[in-house]
């Protein structure tokens, strides 16, 4: 009988390091999905794919189990299915280490008995479901499902009790000896999004509203304090309700809420996200308390990019709260699905702010669920690829998190995508092909060879984001009839934020600059000395202390400071261009642009970027020599000024072109590693270039030699950054 696995995440040599039995281990994994026909480890197709990955060095595997599957109607625990799930993996790979994703959903019968403990929706009634056949139990999560509320004390107690019993019981079995991590899962697709958040406005159920009232009373010092803060004399807590959809979709200035008049909406989103984070921490803590030996506690969390304009409705604004908790070791996320990130030639970057995660000492795991040519894509029948393209994408997607100090799992929907050759084959996994398996083995060996080495990433560009800013921005439900799975929807009330998040990230990744990212809440502790260019992106709300820190610590040492869109337009008490002007040094106004199209032009670069509707946008008054961009009607949209200690820039719309960022970087004295518009990654001693066009390149990694090379078209090439040696071509 094998000795029980012990696992932890520890800060070693500049990175959060996964330790399995005390040994640094590259966190690259293979994962089964929850899809019927592909979810049970002992069945022939999943077992084959587990064995294939094991043959190529993989020892870390992931699979799902639901509390509902291990409890009988009276709540008695039966671990048979969970043990069999782990045993199937161990049968295919005897020295496997297993991460179990434990879904904390209460059974439908529980929800029917406790309707007041379930989520509610401001715009629609919850929709009871009737299960039929082998359904994915999470398939209706983004409708308006009947689900226990995150804020229900009764559900929290139910989940903690049964999760604790599950962990203690499984850990005592022979199969439990192979488990190195428990990933707690709930919310849409287990990813801790509010149920129904795409097209509905959660959570307005009785449990959530009762918790909101308690939270408000604590925040504002009782009922009278709430009435004062909301400027509603005589308001009682009993009268407090969650905001309706109209209130959530309303803005005061452009996309910004009034922090006084709309305080009730801002308060509600603050409550939703603090309570959500506290629930994740609580469940991870239950695992920690119940598992009798060191185990990695994991959770989907920290989603920032690719949130479809629904950041406040269903994102993770309180990520700093989770990062500060010792109960959570590992944050995970599905990939960015935007057209600029997902396909060949895209960036393949993570949904989270990985710099902040790494500095907090948490391990980050990406999900790699990009389809391959082996069996196609179950949600996109028009998908096409080739094995060489599959190799290029696999390399890019697995090395993206590796170069940022994290890891990934390959999430295999291929088994439910159909058979590529009906007369010869049945269901087949996405990576069940010799060249793809060999490539995974090479990537794993590359990552494992670095697992115990010092980590470094020579970034000289820093992008600062504040997830909490989205509590101050209007957001709108998507229209169900317009939704197509796999197609990115756009917001009806906020056309700018996607340019500040996805647009900035994608263009920076393809600029040849090396950037890191940070949370605004990290401002007091950050070391700014490595950075020549600091970008304030989603920072609409900056209080007096933050403005002082920016003026004193960021705008110093000749650094260039870039303000994007509505940065600093609110101080938490007032909102508008005059608030921004008072601290930025730029004469600023709200410009009601009938055609909100910006043309940037400087240092040989030109970029045209526009909104799809008339909108109120920032405009500036400054000497013509300091104007680098104009709106369609000629009003200045992008300006700069030189101060004694720093150079300041302001953009009405953020640059979304790699060339614009390169020009800014050169102005600031940043190193440009690659002059071409293609995904260029640097970190952990690796330089990675992902290209569609290919051709001759001159690459300049910091601290390394100038590399002159001819890249193949549609390829991902990996270099040793310090020597220029080609590691994978």
Sequence positions of predicted segments:
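A short, well-structured beta->alpha microelement
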Residues: 319-320, 507-527
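A conserved amphipathic helix/loop scaffold
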Residues: 390, 537-729
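The substrate-binding groove and active-site-proximal loops of carbohydrate-active enzymes
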Residues: 27-40, 64-80, 140-161, 260-278, ...
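Hydrophobic targeting/anchoring helices
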Residues: 293, 298-502, 590-616, 628-632, ...
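Aromatic-lined substrate-binding rim segments of carbohydrate-active enzymes
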Residues: 43-132, 167-171, 280-291, 541
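Polysaccharide-binding and catalytic clefts of secreted carbohydrate-active enzymes
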Residues: 112-329, 334-337, 347
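Hydrophobic faces of well-ordered beta-strands that scaffold small-molecule active sites
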Residues: 26-32, 61-63, 98-102, 180-184, ...
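N-terminal carbohydrate-binding accessory modules
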Residues: 1-53, 452-453
